[in-house]
A protein has these predicted regions:
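Flexible "stalk/tail and boundary" regions
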Residues: 1-7, 12-15, 21-84, 88-89, ...
Length: 154
């Protein structure tokens, strides 16, 4: 899983080190990089494994091929996606287009979200986190536990 948040600086060549725990998780799935695309909801980037983007692509493909919404999703997600590969030191290079969307200038914040992660400008994420915590608190009763499995703690 992708957990926690890590801030790293973009170097002079435009590369940024991906957190070791994120790289390790991605490598454990058999990949040497990740897919990223502009978020619909935020000035941030969504990031996931190849398997996850294929699942998303299959979901889009399941829509009627002649409906506009299928084209909207495919254009907004798949055509905007980039496959970023780790270099020998675990760094990636983001395109200017992606950095511009996320309003990232010098530092990058990798934010773990479980099966996926996001990439933010740290200051923008700080603002979002305040709102997110407030809304999570307001909606806390909607978060239901699955049936407890043998040996699990409450």
């Amino acid at each position: 899983m992708f957990l926690s948040s890590y801030e790293n600086k973009i170097d002079k060549k435009g590369r940024v080190s991906v957190p070791a725990t994120f790289r390790s998780h991605i490598n454990s799935m058999g990949y040497n990089g990740f897919i990223t695309y502009p978020s619909f909801n935020h000035s941030a980037l969504e990031a996931c494994s190849q398997d996850r983007i294929e699942k998303l692509s299959n979901t889009i493909d399941s829509l009627n091929p002649f409906e506009e919404k299928r084209d909207f999703f495919a254009t907004s997600i798949l055509s905007e996606s980039e496959n970023l590969q780790f270099d020998t030191e675990g760094r990636v290079s983001f395109s200017e287009k992606l950095l511009k969307h996320a309003m990232i200038k010098t530092n990058v914040l990798f934010v773990g979200l479980g099966k996926t992660f996001q990439i933010w400008d740290p200051k923008n994420f700080d603002k979002f986190k305040i709102v997110a915590r407030k809304k999570a608190y307001q909606n806390r009763s909607n978060l239901k536990w699955e049936n407890k499995q043998k040996g699990e703690l409450s």
